[in-house]
Amino acid sequence: MNALAKFGLATVLVTLAVLSNVLVTLSALSGAHAQIQGRQPEALYWQTFLVPEFGTTVEYPAGIFSVPDGKAEKGIGQRFSSADGRSLLTIYTRENEAGDTPASYLKNNLRVGRSALDYEQVTRSFFAISSTGQGLIFYSRCNFSTDAGNAIHCLDLIYPQAEKRAWDGVVTRVSRSLRPLEG
């Protein structure tokens, strides 16, 4: 193979590598890989958070919520924020002193009218609600247990509305992982 042919092959390989990187970048920008804040799903570093007083566990993306941001305001737990401060996760548990059901808890504690909710699911054992405002999405889920000290196990997520599609999988995974410690 002469030098020109070697140069041509090298140029083709470099061009293919550059095009491959461009395609990956374009694909990532389009949200096709569900990137959140520039991270691929495997780089979200999922961890389990435990509220030991009540045995509440939640899987959360520590790669996003990397900054401990104080104790939970509504019970025993922790707040986490993203490094850029645009997203917030609060995990907490509180005693169900009033003996509320998910429906009665919402009725007594919801700070906005039900018409302001974009999503609402209420069952005998949990509620999940979501609303939007000021460019943000607020999502909350609380599981009610009578066998774990009559506790309410909750999480609140706040994240940019413009990134909803990228956040959908994260919200689903975090929400479904909320539970009392089994054992």
Regions found by a protein language model. Name each.
Residues 2-16:
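Bacterial N-terminal signal peptides that target proteins for export
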Residues 16-30:
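C-terminal segment of classical bacterial N-terminal signal peptides
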Residues 29-49:
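N-terminal low-complexity, Pro/Thr/Ser-rich intrinsically disordered segments
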Residues 42-48, 73-78, 121-129:
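Short, hydrophobic/aromatic-rich segments at coil-to-beta transitions
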Residues 50-104, 132-133:
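Secretory pathway targeting signatures of secreted, lumenal, and periplasmic proteins
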Residues 53, 68, 84, 110, ...:
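Sec/Tat-exported extracytoplasmic proteins
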Residues 64-65, 151-183:
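Surface-exposed amphipathic alpha-helical segments
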Residues 103-166:
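Signature of long, low-cysteine stretches enriched in small and polar/charged residues
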